[in-house]
Structure formats: structure tokens, C-alpha cells
């Protein structure tokens, strides 16, 4: 899976974290592992321009998604497996997201992770124009975000256990479980 991030926002953003959450969601949604995604982080003026040009709405917004290939999560069990494709582009506006994060009482990193999940779901055809669509998309968005956080916690626990095990093995004279 190829995920490229271009930070043109002028803000210091953790690109590996954005890649991590995007990769997690793409995998959970059964998208072909060779799919490609592009993420661009822009300033408010650039986002406002995109928002007017593509949505005919004034001012900046938090996230916009531009799908490339028609993809659906999962797919029918009797259909041939889809090949790799270009999911599309997600455009994030960190400065706009920072204001939203402040209002919501959480970190910018959390807000950008949430918006990344949101953007990927839009690329996969989810929408929230109608109440039922919104309920489905936001429920899935929140579930995927929580699963990603749980996955990060699991990885941290495993790393801590591995480090502890190495220390214990070192004290006993065993290294990597091999008797010297």
C-alpha cells in the first residue's frame, strides 16, 4: 500500500501518524493492499480556494476527498478480487482542524486522525448527506478510529513487554532465548 503525504500547510504535523491511521482504515475496509492514496495538507487560503472551486462553498473546511477509482469496501464474495488502484486524494487543512480540536476539547493529532478516517471513508463512497448515511458513516468512523487507537495501545504494550523480557533475559544470561 502506497500512501504519500505532502505537507504544504506550514504546520508541523506527524506524517507517520496520518499514514498509520490511513493504512489501518484501508486495511480494515478490505481495500486491495496495493492501493495508492495521496494526502495533502494545505493552509486555509488553499483550502478555501478548493472549497469554492469543487463544492461552491465559501471559506475553508477541514477535509476534502477526491476519489479516483470507483471502489467499494469488501465487495461481493462471488466477484473476482479487485486489483490495485488509486483511491484518490485527501486534502486536510490543519489550521482549520486545530480550531475544531480546540472547540471539541481534544488534540490536533486526534482531530487529524479523525479527519483522515473521514476522508478515507468518503473515498470509499460513504457520505453523510442524509440522516441514515450520516449515522452509518459517523458510526463506522468512530468505530475505526477507536480500533486504531486500540491497535496502537496493543503495539505499545507488546513493545514494553518485549523490552522487559530482554532485560530479564539479560539478567539471567540468556540472550534472545538462546543459552550461551
From Swiss-Prot:
Q: From the Swiss-Prot or TrEMBL record, state where the protein is found.
A: Cytoplasm
* Residue stretches in coiled coil: none
What's any one GO cellular component for it? cytoplasm
Question: What InterPro entries does its record include?
Answer: MetalPrtase_cat_dom_sf_prd, YbeY, YbeY_CS
User: What is the superkingdom listed in this entry's lineage?
Assistant: Bacteria
Q: Name one GO molecular function term.
A: zinc ion binding
A biological process from GO: rRNA processing
Q: Which named protein is this?
A: Endoribonuclease YbeY
Organism (species): Rhodococcus erythropolis (strain PR4 / NBRC 100887)
